[in-house]
Amino acid sequence: MLCRVDEGWIALDFGEWEEKPIGEITKEEWIRWRSDPSFMPPGGESLEELDRRVALGCEALLLEAEESNVAVFTHVSPIKSAVSWALGTSEQISWNLSVGQAQITRIAVRDGRPVLTSFNETGHLKKP
């Protein structure tokens, strides 16, 4: 399998909020972040921007995935955006999805359309 880096799949840019404790973010900003997909943390990107970026990545892989298996290794927010894309929902669904570490989510291509076939698989991980 060919490996390549695609910047479209990088983590959500939280800007000045990166690694900042939630308690240091104002209540007003947090409420806006959770309710307004166009809101951007200072110096970061919005959920709308993330969804557009990931949707472009998904569309680019659609034809390739019809011919062979494709694997994308990425972060929580792009995974949520890819699921939103596959389901045809809005970016707000991300608040209703929980993505674990090292999990597997599968999106198949059937008749040229995305189909979510599994979400948040962890069966491949060793039990503690």
List each model region and its residues.
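Phosphate-coordination/substrate-recognition cap region in phosphate-metabolizing enzymes
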Residues: 1-30
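Short, active-site-adjacent cap segments at secondary-structure transitions
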Residues: 11-12, 78-80
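Acidic, low-complexity terminal tails and accessory targeting/binding regions
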Residues: 12-23, 63-68, 84-128
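Conserved anionic group-binding/transfer micro-motifs
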Residues: 50-51, 72
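Generic structural signal for well-ordered alpha-helical scaffold segments
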Residues: 51, 55-63, 83
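Generic beta-sheet signal
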Residues: 68-74
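Alpha-helix N-cap/helix-start capping motif
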Residues: 76-77, 101
